[in-house]
């Protein structure tokens, strides 16, 4: 009867499956995610055959497990500790928002938003970042000031480059400060958090590219760009990290209708980069800049910022780079993004792109991109307040976002053959040794002892088998990376005794210590505290780059 | 220029907004989520007026913040610690799956699945639970055995009852064991985890209702239910927690075509409940049961289970209840769910339901429902293996799921006026006191000192203001719940001294201690370790129900 109902379910899986494939295709889809591209193609060319489901995750997404998961959790815990250290509180917003909340915030990237199907009720979309939901939250709850952090997944229907950490579902770790404060103070704290965060993740060779939207806007005015052309010229400038100036200039003049002179004038400025001090000095000596209202405002901000980055001792990480534009609509002041040597695409990227067999994954011909980014957005909260009919109140905001998957891909490169990362937390393995005709295997007895350890907060396991030979139990203990075995000897246990033994190669010849079963918890606790005295574990070493 | 581009964005928000509302309606929508129902209604009756967005989260979802967030994070940390204690590793699967993966797994509840819009590419749906993605993961990676835990959001388009923790987006905290093991061993460990988890969350008055699908199937056979009717009769039995036997009997006979005798026979059995021992004894003495192959298999499992629940000392929490059926298709063995006194709907539920003004939220007339649940599903992994064209291999599974929002709603009830939960982790507030014409406010200096504390891992804040009077700084420190103030006195700081002062009512008259600026880090560390010696903080007390 039961099996009938199961058959029904299996049939229903099969009949509801949208994709028809031949058995040959199915074999291909059972390979790991890397083959997703092939699977997708195959699914679009249905062949005659058995109805089947493809065992894969959707394009641009993946399962996280084993030591990868341990490393990623360690990154989260490092960053959330950092955010808390700076007085951050955390919030959690829904993974989807009303569609209208996301509309008009992301410029050309709006096409990358995932929509939920209209199944009746409200129209919703998956969030594209954590910034817009944060601004919606601040406006909705009339919050005047908050420092909040948020670690959560966001969604973009972009071309994935999985091994470079560019995915369709990925985590952002955001810290934002909302509220009216002394100019550049929360901004410089955000920059300090960038430095502290990356340094504590063992990333040292990074550079914070920084610019100011007002300076950029001033430059465009000076160069003679019309107001209505600013956004499209800004998005041309934004390509300077990937394209040479000549290509960008061509885009400005041939595609975007600017004169040769305008383009050249922009070119003079956007080629500038150096320390805050250097570029500030250059711009301060430029009468065009100092006489342009917007550019002057931006330049004054930079002067203020310099006092604070010096107090935080983070100057050396910052490169004031006038070519940085950033695509998003909502930025109004400082903008910044963090790059490392892995951020840039390979030198022969365009060749590799041509050679790449499939465009489903771009890992072969792209770089990791920026690993963190942020900026000031002073009007976003008020847009929501006004658009919802609330009283207009400006709540200025500034924030940063760490790209965890990209940082993860850098940390992964540090792993060498000697790094062993244990995915379980298990400390103690409870075993039973015995034999003979009347030997039961002490399964309920092992459970009882294990339960005592659990109740004391100690991570403990035992094998799920009535009778297991010592070898199998030691193997299981080793696989779990346990430090200690608690052994129920057939005779010893009857006498109220347990054997406590250190595990590991160097203790192979050590029979351990026979102790009173009544004292097992304090004895194990004492041994564990000795073992853990030596400090850092492998994950911490890896994360910190030690 | 900038403001023009912003105007463009605002216009784009407005023109892209789907919902048109009058200003009056907009005022209503600016109220918190409780008014979501009204807002939705309003949005369905467009009126003439300004284009607007409604500042709300989608129906059945909410933002989490402040002390609620602290409490929920403490629940997660308690449960993940518990899962690790039992040797669990964690995995993370995408929030959406290929639609075909979810098809045919949830019986009548399949209609509650959220679909993603078809924007080209694969058809996907938001996950409905964590169990099906887990089984997909196990099958896809040919995993033979794993203990995994997963704490993540799931999605169901159900009627929400927000204050009872019944939401459309909610967390599940799952622990599952996959692999072929000694009968009932992982099952009893899952039950032990239920007891350990709820107890450590301060929930003591709960009952684990437990049944066995094979016994239930045997009973249906004994009563004369035809094989093809089993699922629908099972789903009638499943309603016994909400409806009286008479109503269920009526459904069986009048709607579902069973004879009076069959229904009465089922009734005899499903009314049985008591301890494992009691009901096991009753069923063992029943020749109908012992001679039915399926029922006998189930009964043997129960006998084995009893040995282990005794070893784990959890018998007293279990009620063997033959009326428990559970709706999901995939269970094959033990099934269980945890209820408390808050689980049941109010006694006058149907009256309240009639009175309730809106059916958008059911909080007024429903109970919290079960707060945790689970069971054995031995065929789900193999369904995926077979349907994907892989070799058929049975990987038996058993698991449990904690309903965090429901547990949260129980813990919230413990909060009384004296409970203060601090949403930030900030320990130290860095202040500057001074005055006079030449007083700068020591902002960069405060930053420098704060940075020293951050670098030593100490949670520290300062006010984001060039000059702030002492009152404002103390207020900010108090708001952040700080224990210590580090004060830069105008003269003292110039002499290389800092003042360290305990905060709080009882230290109001204490001027603190003047120390050398060079020693500030160890001195603050020492003071903090003294302060935290007294142990448990308010959140821990609240979570543990102390």
Curated annotation (Swiss-Prot), chains A, B:
PROSITE patterns reported for this sequence: AA_TRNA_LIGASE_II
Transit peptide extent on chain: 1-20
UniProt binding sites for L-histidine: 129-131, 156, 172, 176, 326, 330-331
Effect on the protein upon substituting residue 198 to V: Rescues the lethal phenotype of the deletion mutant
Record's catalysed reaction(s): tRNA(His) + L-histidine + ATP = L-histidyl-tRNA(His) + AMP + diphosphate + H(+)
Gene3D superfamilies in UniProt: Anticodon-binding domain, Bira Bifunctional Protein, Domain 2
EC numbers, comma separated: 6.1.1.21
UniProt GO MF annotations: aminoacyl-tRNA ligase activity; ATP binding; histidine-tRNA ligase activity; mRNA binding; RNA binding; sequence-specific mRNA binding
Enzyme class: ligase
GO biological processes: histidyl-tRNA aminoacylation; mitochondrial translation
InterPro entries per UniProt: aa-tRNA-synth_II, aa-tRNA-synth_II/BPL/LPL, Anticodon-bd, Anticodon-bd_dom_sf, His-tRNA-ligase, HisRS-like_core, HisRS/HisZ, HisRS_anticodon
GO CC terms: cytoplasm; cytosol; mitochondrion
Description of the deletion phenotype: Lethal.
Domain of life (superkingdom): Eukaryota
UniProt keyword terms in alphabetical order: Aminoacyl-tRNA synthetase, ATP-binding, Cytoplasm, Ligase, Mitochondrion, Nucleotide-binding, Protein biosynthesis, Transit peptide
Protein family (similarity comment): Belongs to the class-II aminoacyl-tRNA synthetase family.
Role: Catalyzes the aminoacylation of histidyl-tRNA in both the cytoplasm and the mitochondrion.
Note: Present with 26800 molecules/cell in log phase SD medium.
Protein name per Swiss-Prot or TrEMBL: Histidine--tRNA ligase, mitochondrial
Organism: Saccharomyces cerevisiae (strain ATCC 204508 / S288c) (Baker's yeast)
């Amino acid at each position: 009867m039961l099996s009938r109902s199961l058959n029904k379910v299996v049939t229903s899986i099969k009949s509801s499956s949208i994709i028809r494939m031949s058995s040959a295709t199915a074999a291909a889809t059972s390979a790991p995610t890397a083959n997703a591209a092939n699977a997708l193609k195959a699914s679009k060319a249905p062949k005659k055959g058995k109805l089947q489901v493809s065992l894969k995750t959707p394009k641009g997404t993946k399962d996280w497990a084993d030591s990868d998961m341990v490393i990623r959790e360690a990154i989260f815990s490092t960053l959330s500790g950092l955010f808390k250290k700076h007085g951050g509180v955390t919030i959690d917003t829904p993974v989807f928002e009303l569609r209208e909340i996301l509309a008009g915030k992301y410029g050309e990237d709006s096409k990358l938003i995932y929509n939920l199907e209209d199944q009746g009720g409200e129209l919703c979309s998956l969030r594209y970042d954590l910034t817009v939901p944060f601004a919606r939250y601040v406006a909705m709850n009339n919050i005047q000031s908050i420092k909040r952090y948020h670690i959560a997944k966001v969604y973009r229907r972009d071309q994935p480059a999985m091994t470079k950490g560019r995915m369709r579902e990925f985590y952002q770790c955001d810290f934002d400060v909302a509220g009216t404060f002394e100019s550049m103070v929360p901004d410089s704290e955000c920059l300090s958090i960038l430095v502290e965060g990356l340094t504590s993740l063992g990333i040292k060779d990074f550079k914070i590219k920084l610019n100011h939207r007002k300076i950029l806007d001033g430059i465009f005015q000076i160069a003679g760009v019309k107001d209505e052309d600013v956004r499209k010229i800004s998005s041309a400038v934004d390509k300077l990290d990937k394209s040479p100036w000549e290509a960008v200039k061509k885009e400005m003049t041939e595609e975007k209708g600017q004169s040769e002179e305008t383009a050249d004038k922009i070119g003079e400025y956007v080629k500038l980069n150096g320390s805050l001090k250097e570029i500030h000095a250059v711009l301060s000596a430029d009468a065009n800049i100092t006489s342009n209202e917007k550019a002057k405002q931006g330049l004054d901000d930079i002067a203020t910022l310099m006092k604070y980055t010096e107090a935080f001792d983070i100057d050396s990480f910052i490169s004031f780079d006038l070519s940085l534009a950033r695509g998003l609509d909502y930025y109004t002041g400082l903008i910044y993004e963090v790059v490392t040597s892995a951020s840039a695409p390979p030198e022969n990227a365009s060749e590799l792109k041509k050679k790449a067999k499939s465009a489903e994954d771009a890992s072969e011909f792209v770089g990791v991109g920026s690993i963190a980014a942020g900026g000031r957005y002073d009007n976003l909260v008020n847009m929501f307040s006004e658009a919802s009919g609330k009283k207009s109140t400006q709540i200025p905001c500034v924030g940063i976002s760490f790209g965890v998957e990209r940082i993860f891909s850098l940390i992964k490169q540090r792993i060498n053959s000697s790094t062993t990362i244990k995915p379980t937390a298990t400390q103690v393995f409870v075993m039973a040794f015995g034999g003979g005709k009347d030997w039961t295997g002490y399964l309920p007895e092992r459970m009882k002892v294990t339960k005592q350890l659990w109740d004391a907060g100690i991570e403990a396991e035992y094998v799920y088998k009535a009778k297991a030979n010592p070898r199998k139990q030691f193997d299981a203990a080793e696989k779990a990376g346990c430090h200690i075995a608690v052994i129920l000897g057939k005779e010893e246990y009857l006498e109220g005794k347990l054997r406590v033994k250190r595990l590991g190669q160097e203790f192979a010849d050590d029979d351990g210590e026979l102790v009173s079963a009544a004292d097992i918890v304090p004895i194990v606790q004492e041994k564990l505290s000795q073992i853990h005295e030596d400090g850092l574990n492998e994950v911490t070493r890896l994360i910190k780059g030690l």
